């Protein structure tokens, strides 16, 4: 080890070059690192959505949810499985373990879903399996509204033009249209006219299936030519559908237009969206797991001017929400703290060393260690985020320790009469092994945090290894650069300056005061021990009364809300409830914008977001605004309204801070009864502001009983009855038609 330190003291150019290489390579690595709010976590969810138009919740549960659940429960890497069976739709969510391979789990899930596809009802749509890795919330929401275009027209334009452009931005995983209404050929049957003309629902379905048919007619080949054939066997307009013959009574033809109203309209009437009180359609921008959110949003903002320039007259585009505003502010605050911490450390070092030259040597260690650790961050695939920046803030006070020890030891030999060069040689020999021991000890304290499993380990791994890496780099610099700088910069001071003398006198006074207090405490040992016991007891009390949480709630300038209408409600009812919520929110001066998506995730629910004014323009914090809104939402009579802060950490879902899962081998009626009793007890306790049960067992329904004997006498079977009901009431999908290069459903 002596030869190692001697090499750099005797060869100052080598020591300088090595340090410059650390600075250069670390700086280049730092410029290439991603900048994000938190470390990237591979939290992945796989969602299986199956629609069965017109089916009741119990039918969905028994014929769709249960078979798929049983099939995918053994899929690889699953941590938890959650399913929901609602009117028309089954949703199964698989939450994967953090260490699971998402691609392998996706392939395994697809295979198992395909195995049970034949067991599902014939009229049910194919299950849609979607994998989502990374943040569950969008990085940005774009709002599109118009006074002249319908929601379907806006949605169609966004689908054809805007969505594809946004998805070409580097790092964008999906540009999802929310609150829109897709075009469809809607056929509204008139049962009275159908009965008068002797036409059944099955006749209509059969005619549509037979006469709106897409044909691949092939091509005609001759000796020198080859010409494709386009057979016009499909329908392309409401007028063409109206002329479709569905029955013939002698010479009289019954056309579809005789028994139905036909129009090109929205595919469904179960969703709508609002931005600041105006009807709108949103696009949510979701980033890939490895993408830098700041770069992604910068890319989206860069193409927004050209998107706005190409919008049809009367269509406006607005950035409704940008999550990177908080990310940038957070990183700025931590970076500012980093600079402040460095300045404080420099002042403290100067006050204790009392010499500019002695102070300069450990100060050099700060940028070299912080920049040098960037090499390790890049090698490990880490990013610059709040936790790695926090590690750098803490490292500032640690990386100077080794250099200060080296400077003090060498300075002691110089004061004893040795030359700076000889003092550096001897001082480095004496302190080399203690420096190595200090470095390894500090690194060993923090590094084990990086091996913790679960969400905590995924979040704090980068923090631990960044801190340990900075300490290791500082130890290397203390053994290579610091002794060389001491041999060149330090000298024997014959007389101290006035500032050094002032600092020495101040510390001498402090030392004398401490000495007096120390003697006093030794003279009253019983009292000293009693004070110690009291402090320890008070510490225990304070620890027990301190709230515990994985991460504190931060003021992100954004609040979320879920609105749930009664089970009998439709979209009109939900819109009425959200309008009341919008009125209450707009009365809060700290709120700048409000967006709402009605019919999400179902027609009796809505999702809302409240954007707060910039931090400098409001006096109340996000938590205070939430506390002001919650009582107002409890007074909304039409629905249950819950407001909450966005999740503080990636991988968390936000929402209710306390949740209970009730399981039973009995029926759902028993489960609902127990859940409602628990909810009532929670309300009566006075400890909960909002309570909700996700099992809704009070949904009203009409029960249609068929007299099988009478049906047989008139020649009607159960399949005919079921098909007729599904066609008349369920809004069944029949087939597709083409319009301007895109296909739409016939319903």
Question: Where would I find each of the regions flagged by the language model?
Answer:
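C-terminal transmembrane helical bundles of large multi-pass transporters
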Residues: 29, 268, 323, 360, ...
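Helix-loop junctions and hydrophobic alpha-helical segments within the transmembrane domains
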Residues: 320, 327, 331, 407, ...
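Hydrophobic alpha-helical transmembrane segments of multipass membrane transporters and ion channels
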Residues: 14-18, 335-344, 365, 369, ...
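Juxtamembrane segments of multi-pass membrane proteins
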Residues: 532-632, 656, 677, 708
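Hydrophobic, glycine/alanine-rich multi-pass transmembrane helices and their short helix-loop junctions
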Residues: 347-352, 372-387, 436-487, 540, ...
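Membrane-proximal extracytoplasmic
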Residues: 1-343, 384, 458, 639, ...
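Hydrophobic transmembrane alpha-helices and their membrane-interface caps
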Residues: 25-32, 36-37, 343-412, 419, ...
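Signature of alpha-helical transmembrane segments and their immediate interfacial
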Residues: 1-35, 431, 499-550, 610, ...
């Amino acid at each position: 080890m002596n030869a190692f330190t001697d090499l750099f003291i005797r060869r100052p150019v080598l020591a300088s070059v090595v340090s410059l290489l650390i600075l250069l390579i670390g700086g280049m690595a730092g410029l290439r690192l991603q900048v994000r709010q938190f470390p990237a976590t591979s939290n992945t969810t796989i969602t299986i959505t199956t629609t069965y138009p017109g089916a009741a919740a119990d039918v969905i549960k028994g014929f769709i949810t249960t078979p798929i659940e049983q099939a995918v429960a053994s899929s690889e890497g699953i941590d938890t499985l959650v399913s929901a069976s609602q009117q028309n739709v089954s949703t199964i969510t698989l939450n994967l373990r953090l260490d699971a391979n998402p691609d392998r789990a996706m392939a395994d899930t697809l295979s198992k879903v395909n195995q049970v596809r034949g067991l599902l009802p014939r009229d049910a749509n194919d299950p849609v399996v979607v994998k989502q890795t990374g943040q569950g919330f969008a990085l940005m929401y774009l709002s599109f509204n118009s006074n002249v275009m319908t929601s379907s027209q806006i949605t169609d334009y966004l689908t054809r033009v805007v969505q594809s452009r946004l998805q070409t931005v580097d790092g964008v995983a999906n540009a999802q249209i929310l609150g829109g209404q897709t075009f469809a050929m809607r056929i509204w049957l008139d049962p009275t006219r159908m009965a008068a003309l002797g036409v059944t629902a099955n006749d209509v379905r059969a005619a549509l299936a037979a006469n709106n048919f897409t044909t691949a007619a092939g091509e005609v080949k001759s000796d020198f030519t080859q010409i494709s054939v386009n057979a016009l066997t499909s329908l392309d307009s409401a007028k063409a559908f109206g002329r479709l013959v569905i029955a013939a009574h002698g010479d009289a033809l019954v056309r579809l237009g005789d028994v139905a109203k036909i129009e090109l309209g929205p595919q469904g009437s179960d969703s709508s969206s609002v931005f600041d009180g105006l009807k709108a359609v949103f696009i949510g921008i979701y980033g890939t797991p490895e993408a830098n959110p700041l770069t992604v949003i910068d890319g989206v903002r860069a193409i927004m001017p050209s998107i706005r320039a190409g919008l049809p007259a009367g269509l406006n585009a607005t950035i409704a929400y940008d999550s990177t505003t908080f990310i940038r502010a957070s990183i700025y605050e931590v970076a500012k703290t980093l600079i402040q911490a460095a300045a404080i450390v420099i002042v403290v070092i100067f006050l204790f060393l009392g010499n500019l030259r002695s102070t300069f040597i450990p100060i050099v260690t700060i940028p070299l260690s912080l920049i040098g650790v960037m090499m390790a961050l890049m090698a490990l695939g880490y990013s610059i985020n709040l936790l790695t920046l926090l590690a750098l803030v803490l490292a500032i006070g640690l990386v100077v320790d080794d250099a200060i020890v080296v400077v003090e030891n060498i300075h002691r030999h110089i004061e004893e009469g040795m030359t700076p060069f000889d003092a550096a040689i001897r001082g480095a020999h004496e302190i080399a092994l203690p420096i190595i021991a200090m470095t390894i000890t500090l690194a060993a304290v923090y590094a084990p945090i990086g091996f913790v499993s679960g969400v905590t380990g995924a979040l704090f791994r980068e923090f631990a290894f960044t801190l340990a890496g900075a300490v290791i780099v500082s130890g290397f610099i203390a053994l290579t650069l610091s002794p060389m700088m001491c041999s060149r910069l330090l000298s024997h001071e014959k007389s101290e300056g006035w500032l050094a003398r002032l600092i020495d006198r101040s510390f001498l006074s402090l030392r004398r005061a401490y000495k007096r207090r120390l003697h006093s405490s030794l003279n009253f040992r019983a009292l000293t021990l009693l004070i110690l016991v009291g402090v320890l007891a008070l510490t225990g009390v304070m620890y027990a009364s301190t709230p515990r949480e994985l991460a504190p709630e931060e003021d992100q300038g954004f609040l979320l809300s879920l609105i749930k209408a009664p089970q009998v409600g439709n979209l009109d009812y939900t819109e009425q409830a959200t309008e009341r919520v919008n009125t209450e929110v707009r009365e809060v001066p700290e709120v700048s914008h409000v967006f709402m998506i009605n019919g999400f995730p179902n027609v009796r629910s809505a999702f809302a977001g409240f954007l707060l004014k910039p931090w400098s323009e409001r006096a109340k914090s996000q938590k205070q605004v939430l506390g002001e809104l919650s009582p107002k939402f409890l007074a909304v009579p039409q629905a249950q309204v819950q407001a909450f802060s966005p999740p503080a950490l990636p991988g968390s879902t936000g929402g209710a801070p306390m949740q209970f899962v009730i399981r039973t081998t009995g029926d759902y009626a028993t489960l609902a009864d127990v859940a409602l009793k628990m909810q009532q007890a929670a309300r009566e306790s006075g400890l909960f502001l909002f309570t909700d049960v996700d099992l809704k067992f009070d949904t009203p329904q009409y029960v249609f009983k068929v007299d099988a004997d009478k049906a047989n006498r008139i020649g009607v079977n159960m399949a005919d009855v079921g098909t007729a009901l599904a066609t008349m009431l369920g809004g069944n999908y029949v087939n597709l038609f083409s319009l301007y290069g895109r296909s739409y459903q016939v319903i």
